[in-house]
């Protein structure tokens, strides 16, 4: 039906007759002459109808925005003074000779001249996707997946599909369950990841596997979360963690170079403990110059118990953030608002100190400083603080003093807030690897895996691990870019005794382990090779690379924040006959109980 895409017409086609198909993006009637901007996936081109063809002009007069049309015409150079340098096809236009209306369009429920609500955009997603911005993002996504496949396949990776209907496994979020008609009362689960299947593929001798795969998690949603999302899933045999990081870093660097013309350079590596101590996050945004600075040793002897208490507690922490030239940026009201903000993360307050004259302060320890806590500090302590933070005139210092996790999380969140709101971010791209994660964390007396229960410890036997699980480090690694976790992976457990030990540490009984993971434990008996892998969030990667504010803007048909689809009205009620065939009964849940479940979640 067409000989060219609209956005591909250029000066080399001048004098040629061509056929175009697309949508009327804009129509301008200048009396005897009608101008159309015709749009397709590749872009826009200007079409001109002049009075020499009255029948065609008559038909063109009936056109409205979003009519779907076929146009035959002759390419010509635009008249002098009418060239549009801001348009890819701005040097030419098409003289319309024939016009076929393929389909008319009703008035659009979306307004292209204003910002439409998220709900409306998702309800009419097929119209929202016609916008150039959305088309470009989906095109870019396709380029990413193509480049990923090319990179991995050039390194010997095989694209192998794994099941979508599988068994439930404890991976941290709720499963989406699918009732079985042939096995009444039993359920499949949609996979939260292909984790166990890709490990089994390594035990099958596949050695290098990848898959661009859908995953499903029934969890509370945020801007970068969806109930169904796409992973770039990778697993290898006979590779160390260093080698896996090299392979996947190479892929990401090639991706940015090819699609964005950006050289990310070599990714630095940072231990988890350093990331938490310096930045208050296991996915630090290195564009932000602010850091958390420990001052426990300076304040452990002050009379102010808010400081000396945590400073002398092995589980406590006293740390500060020094904000350059921040003293004048915050009134008392502004400081109160920041105090409320850190309170969200458990902080009971946020003392502060303004440096009005650093020379006077370093001389006296008192003069040149402004703070409600100044009376609790000796001259030596104040001077030591200023030297530790390298404070200058005009700076402000924010304090955190509490249990280690509270201080780290609250100051880490404050660091991000200040960096974004005060435009402190430096550079466009700052990648890194975070390594040496703890293997477990203890919550309410129970051990939980930081990553997942199939992650191997670093240089420990099963006996050593069970003797001191809290002190164990995992052979895991996360790739972080601009404060977002792009991907995470680890060396896997390939020894049955080690896997059984991890299950015991996590409180999984032998009976439960056999019921849920018996197939894995058995497979580990038959010469399972050392193996490791990593998974990238494709949606998040494309979101970062395109500058989108949400992963919903880089997915064709995403769900809302309530995991619903306004376009198809999913989820919906099932047909009673279908429920009978499945042996499923729907209980009526009162609203109060639903709210209680949400709060507990």
UniProtKB/Swiss-Prot annotation:
| Important for tRNA non-discrimination (site feature) positions | 81
Provide the residue positions that the database annotates as binding ATP: 217-219, 226, 485, 537-540
**GO molecular-function term, one example from the UniProt record:** ATP binding
Sequence positions that bind L-aspartate: 171, 217, 451, 492
Region (Aspartate): which ranges?
195-198
Main localization of the protein described in the UniProt heading? cytoplasm
EC number of the protein: 6.1.1.23
**Subcellular location, record wording:** Cytoplasm
Record's keyword terms, sorted: Aminoacyl-tRNA synthetase, ATP-binding, Cytoplasm, Ligase, Nucleotide-binding, Protein biosynthesis
The Gene Ontology biological process annotation of the record reads: aspartyl-tRNA aminoacylation
Q: Which family does it belong to?
A: Belongs to the class-II aminoacyl-tRNA synthetase family. Type 1 subfamily.
| Its job | Aspartyl-tRNA synthetase with relaxed tRNA specificity since it is able to aspartylate not only its cognate tRNA(Asp) but also tRNA(Asn). Reaction proceeds in two steps: L-aspartate is first activated by ATP to form Asp-AMP and then transferred to the acceptor end of tRNA(Asp/Asn).
Subunit info here reads: Homodimer.
Write down what this protein is called. Answer: Aspartate--tRNA(Asp/Asn) ligase
What is the gene called?
Answer: aspS
């Amino acid at each position: 039906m067409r000989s060219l895409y609209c956005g591909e017409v250029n000066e080399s086609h001048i004098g040629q007759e061509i056929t175009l198909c697309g949508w009327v993006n804009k129509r301008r009637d200048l009396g005897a002459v009608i101008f159309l901007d015709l749009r397709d996936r590749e872009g826009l081109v200007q079409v001109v109808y002049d009075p020499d063809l009255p029948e065609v002009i008559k038909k063109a007069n009936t056109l409205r925005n979003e009519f779907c049309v076929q146009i035959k015409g002759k390419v010509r150079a635009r008249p002098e003074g009418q060239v549009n340098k801001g348009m890819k096809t701005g040097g030419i236009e098409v003289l319309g000779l024939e016009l076929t209306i393929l389909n008319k369009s009703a008035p659009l429920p979306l307004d292209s001249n204003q910002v439409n609500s998220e709900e409306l955009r998702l309800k009419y997603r097929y119209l929202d996707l016609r916008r150039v911005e959305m088309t470009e993002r989906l095109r870019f996504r396709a380029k990413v997946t193509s480049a990923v496949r090319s990179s991995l396949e050039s390194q010997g990776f095989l694209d192998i599909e794994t099941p979508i209907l599988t068994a439930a496994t404890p991976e941290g979020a709720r499963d989406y369950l699918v009732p079985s008609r042939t096995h009444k009362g039993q359920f499949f689960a949609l996979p939260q990841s292909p984790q166990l299947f890709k490990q089994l593929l390594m035990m099958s001798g596949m050695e290098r596997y990848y898959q661009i795969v859908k995953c499903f998690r029934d969890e509370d949603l945020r801007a970068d979360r969806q109930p169904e999302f796409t992973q770039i899933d990778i697993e290898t045999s006979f590779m160390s963690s260093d080698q896996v990081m090299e392979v996947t870093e190479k892929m990401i660097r090639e991706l940015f170079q090819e699609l964005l013309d950006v050289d990310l350079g070599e990714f630095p590596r940072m231990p988890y403990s350093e990331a938490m101590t310096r930045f208050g996050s296991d996915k630090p945004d290195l564009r932000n110059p602010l850091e958390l600075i420990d001052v426990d040793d300076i304040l452990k002897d002050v009379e102010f118990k808010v400081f000396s208490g945590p400073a002398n507690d092995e589980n406590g922490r006293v740390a500060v953030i020094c904000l350059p030239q921040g003293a004048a940026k915050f009134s008392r009201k502004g400081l109160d608002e920041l105090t409320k903000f850190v309170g969200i993360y458990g902080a009971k307050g946020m003392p502060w100190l303004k440096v009005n004259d650093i020379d006077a302060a370093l001389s006296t320890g008192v003069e040149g400083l402004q703070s409600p806590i100044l009376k609790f500090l000796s001259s030596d302590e104040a001077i030591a603080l200023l030297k530790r933070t390298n404070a200058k005139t005009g700076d402000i210092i924010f304090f955190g003093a509490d249990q280690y996790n509270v201080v780290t999380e609250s100051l880490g969140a404050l660091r991000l807030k200040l960096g974004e709101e005060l435009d402190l971010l430096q550079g466009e791209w700052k990648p890194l690897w975070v390594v040496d994660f703890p293997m477990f964390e203890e919550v309410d007396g129970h051990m939980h895996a930081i990553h997942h229960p199939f992650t191997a410890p670093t240089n420990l036997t099963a006996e050593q691990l069970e003797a001191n699980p809290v002190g164990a480090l995992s052979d895991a690694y996360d790739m972080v870019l601009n404060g977002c976790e792009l991907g995470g992976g680890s060396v896997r457990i390939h020894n049955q005794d080690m896997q059984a030990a991890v299950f015991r540490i996590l409180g999984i009984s032998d009976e439960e382990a056999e019921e849920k993971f018996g197939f894995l434990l058995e497979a580990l008996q038959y010469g399972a090779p050392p193996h490791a892998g990593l998974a990238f969030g494709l949606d998040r990667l494309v979101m970062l690379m395109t500058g989108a504010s949400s992963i919903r803007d880089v997915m064709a048909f995403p769900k809302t924040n309530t995991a619903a689809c306004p376009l198809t009205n999913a989820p919906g009620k099932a047909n009673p006959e279908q429920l009978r065939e499945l042996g499923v009964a729907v209980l009526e849940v009162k609203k109060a109980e639903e709210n209680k479940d949400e709060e507990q979640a």
